[in-house]
Amino acid sequence: MDSIDLFYDKGKLELCTFINEPTNKFMKLSSFVYGIISFHDGKIRVPGRLTDQLITDDDDVDFSSLEGREVVPRFRRRYSVDKSDLIPTISLAFTLADEYYPHQEYSVLAPNKEYDIPGVVGYGVYTSRFRIKESGLERAVPFIDEDSATASVEAGKLALIHSGVDSRLVGKVYVGSESNPYAVKPIASKVAQVLKLGEEDGDIQGVDAVDTEFACKAATSMFKDAASLVSYPRSGIKYAMVIGADNAQAAPRGCIGGELDTFVGYGGAAFIFGKHDVIAEVEGWYSCTSDTPDFWRRDGEPFPMHGGRFTGDPAYFKHVRKATQKLMEHFNLKASDLNYFVAHQPNPQFPVRIAKELGFRDEQYLPSIQINKFGNTYSGCSPVGLAAVLDIAKPEERILVTSYGSGAGSDAYLLRTTSQLVDKRKRQKINVKFQAENPFIEYVDYTTYRRLKLGM
């Protein structure tokens, strides 16, 4: 019997019921809606849970407002398990297609123009519809069945849709995260399986998948590796995917390390690198590293600690400054020669300060500042900023993006956009602005925020 993949399809919620007394495995979900979803004009019917719904036992659920509406498959945790157990996931949770996450068709395009140097051929950003808003700062909050693995899959899916790349041609996938639900078990293998990356043989994907770690630059460190790999003629790899995703962690306020709880967010970004139909060429890069103890999380500890004054000048500013200046010197560039500058955003102040110090004008760096909308998404932070710039950039513009990872190091990249950037833009409904200003965003209080961050 052939397997059926509905992950990119759109379904219809035919019948549903309200589960207000869930069994133990589903207890953390509280009350939820369960139903029958049909696909392909009713030829296929599957049971599924409606997710991204905060429902209390007292809520009066109007089934007539749900039944008959179109839904989109989502990749989520399935139910709660003990800490030592495997985490069950499923791609048959669903959200309403006319709300935060609309359906987008995944149509594969044959490779067309080949470029001399590699670059980004597509990208995607995923953040949750839930937010907490305090003192003018909004932060994305995962729903209770989300984590860094589910965000990685969703971001990778959006990148494939945007690029038009055949998933079977992706020969390498990197996932950078510091909030993997497992200490030993990669996110990348799950991404590869769900998105069917590489040639599929039975239940095995012909793709190299690896997780990476270097605090908030775990993903950007791999940009150069991905670009190099697709350029090596003997690798046989046409495309490589790099994902940065985190459910950024911080101790509760009032506890040691709780100061970080003001800025942590949730989400991820995925970039596909190749030499065909490039939207932004990678012109060059520079990386720097030092053993600086500005931020850490010991093995077995749930929340990170930070080194106070070491997080500023000796850490973030020193590395971002050096990587940026060295790259600009190598290409004999002044700040005025660039169209956009993207820096890592641990808080709203640091990226603005370093941008001004380096001579960039407001219009060069402000489009990348997304921490005020999503919070610090750790490994996804500077990639989300880069995506925000790519969403609005014009052809033949130069972008300098400099990431930062505690412990400590920075990667600076120089990108040049192409005409294909505009051509592919219409393929992506769910861009950064769409998610930042979405009318279906749901705001939660601090107690709910802490509960959702802990997950199932």
Question: Locations of the language-model features?
Answer:
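Phosphate/pyrophosphate-binding loops at sites that engage ATP/ADP/AMP, CoA/4′-phosphopantetheine
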Residues: A155-G171, R321-D337, L358, A393
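Claisen-condensing/thiolase-fold acyl-transfer catalytic domains that form or cleave C-C bonds
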Residues: A149, V153, S179-N180, G198-G206, ...
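Flexible, glycine-rich active-site loops centered on histidine and acidic residues
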Residues: A227, S231-A270
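Cys/His-rich short segments
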Residues: M1-Y8, M456
